[in-house]
């Protein structure tokens, strides 16, 4: 199967690479199947490309690359939803918003991380309650460098 992404062009989709989000992502419950694509070499960015809606993709990061102290404890229900028993086996990513392609103004949703079971290829976006994390945490500081540990 092939899809055409406005960002990536034509992509060959291998069924065994698709990550299924049984409940979709928040605000996108109709889209349940995605590919996780690595960004350009040397960048910390990943892309979650919808298989069902070709013009839909999300910029993602491993939050610990920017926020050393970022830690979450998914509930046992959240882990069960993606067939995991231990949270340390999960891949944790967060969604990045880049306003008007201005990377220096990018924000990251630390309050709503995505957890993925890489073996079962199942994912879920969770909401951390209670949490000091925000949905629009600056990715970079005022000097345009990584906002390391700035949570």
UniProtKB/Swiss-Prot annotation:
Functional description taken from the UniProt entry: Acts as an anti-CsrA protein, binds CsrA and prevents it from repressing translation of its target genes, one of which is flagellin. Binds to flagellin and participates in the assembly of the flagellum.
Gene that encodes the chain: fliW
Family: Belongs to the FliW family.
Domain of life: Bacteria
A single GO cellular-component term on record: cytoplasm
Disulfide bridge map: none
Subunit structure: Interacts with translational regulator CsrA and flagellin(s).
Subcellular location(s) per record: Cytoplasm
Protein species of origin: Natranaerobius thermophilus (strain ATCC BAA-1301 / DSM 18059 / JW/NM-WN-LF)
This protein's UniProt keywords: Bacterial flagellum biogenesis, Chaperone, Cytoplasm, Translation regulation
Biological processes annotated in GO: bacterial-type flagellum assembly; regulation of translation
Protein name listed in UniProt: Flagellar assembly factor FliW
Coarse class of the protein's main subcellular location: cytoplasm
Pfam families in the cross-refs: FliW
Record-linked InterPro entries: Flagellar_assembly_factor_FliW, Flagellar_assmbl_FliW_dom_sf
């Amino acid at each position: 199967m092939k899809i055409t992404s406005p960002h990536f062009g034509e992509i060959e989709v291998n069924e065994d690479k698709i990550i299924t989000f049984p409940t979709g992502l928040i605000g996108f419950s109709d889209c349940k199947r995605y590919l996780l694509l690595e960004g350009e070499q040397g960048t910390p960015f990943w892309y979650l490309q919808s298989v069902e809606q070709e013009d839909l993709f999300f910029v993602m990061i491993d939050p610990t690359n920017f926020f050393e102290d970022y830690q979450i404890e998914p509930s046992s229900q959240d882990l069960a939803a993606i067939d995991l028993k231990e949270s340390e086996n999960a891949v944790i990513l967060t969604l990045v918003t880049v306003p008007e392609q201005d990377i220096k103004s990018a924000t990251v949703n630390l309050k709503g991380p995505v957890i993925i079971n890489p073996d079962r290829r199942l994912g879920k976006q969770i909401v951390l309650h209670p949490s000091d994390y925000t949905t629009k945490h600056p990715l970079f500081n005022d000097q345009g460098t990584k906002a390391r540990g700035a949570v």
